[in-house]
From Swiss-Prot:
Gene Ontology, cellular component aspect: cytoplasm; ribosome
Assembly description: Binds ribosomal protein uS19.
Function, in words: An accessory protein needed during the final step in the assembly of 30S ribosomal subunit, possibly for assembly of the head region. Essential for efficient processing of 16S rRNA. May be needed both before and after RbfA during the maturation of 16S rRNA. It has affinity for free ribosomal 30S subunits but not for 70S ribosomes.
Bridged cysteine pairs (disulfide): none
Protein name as it appears in the record: Ribosome maturation factor RimM
Entry annotated with the keyword Glycoprotein: no
Main subcellular location of this protein, as a coarse class: cytoplasm
Family, per entry: Belongs to the RimM family.
Organism: Synechococcus sp. (strain CC9311)
């Protein structure tokens, strides 16, 4: 990682200027490749060469150069190669870092579409009620995305982000509707 300054349009200390798109979860092989767990539905962020930023917990983002990337067959993980990371030890030192892009680089979406990360912070409501039961606190990407919802009771539950369970998302109004099967919110 180099300490090259961030783009002038992004404040390295403001989380609002950055969009987390993945996490480095492990070294791959002996030549410095890294496994990346994506938090983005745009694979070009992991396969097209160019500038990205890495952020270790409690640190400012640091600029890195993505040289190449590929998706592992049959998995949601990517393998990426970063400039200056040439061996397993230097790759292992980056495990746990969050991969960022400037928030201004979000792809344009069609009307009615939204970025999954925009769901964090929305109120969760049950069908037939205007009262919130909790707030979306995190998004867990995988085969099926999961919403982590902190209930008003203080308990945290994971809810599959599928249309049958989350049939309505109202970003502008700040809420989403849940129609969970019996017992899901009690797990």
């Amino acid at each position: 990682m180099t300490s090259t300054p961030s783009p002038s349009t992004a404040d390295p200390n403001s989380t609002n200027d950055w969009l987390p798109v993945g996490t480095l979860v492990g070294a791959q092989g002996l030549k410095g490749e890294l496994r990346l767990n994506p938090a983005s539905d745009f694979p070009e962020r992991f396969t097209e060469p160019g500038t990205r930023w890495l952020q270790a917990k409690g640190s400012a983002p640091k600029e890195v150069e993505l040289l190449e990337g590929r998706q592992l067959p049959g998995k949601s993980l990517y393998v990426v190669r970063l400039k200056g990371v040439n061996n397993r030890a230097s790759a292992e030192a980056l495990v746990g870092c969050t991969v960022l892009v400037p928030a201004k680089d979000r792809p344009e979406l069609a009307e009615g579409e939204f970025h999954l990360l925009d769901l964090v912070g929305l109120e969760a409501r049950l069908a037939g009620s205007d009262e919130p039961i909790g707030t979306v606190s995190n998004l867990i990407s995988g085969g099926n995305d999961l919403l982590e919802i902190k209930l008003n009771s203080g308990k945290t539950v994971l809810v599959p982000f599928v249309e049958a369970i989350v049939p309505d998302v109202q970003l502008e109004e700040g809420w989403l509707l849940l129609t969970p099967p019996p017992g899901l919110l009690e797990l």
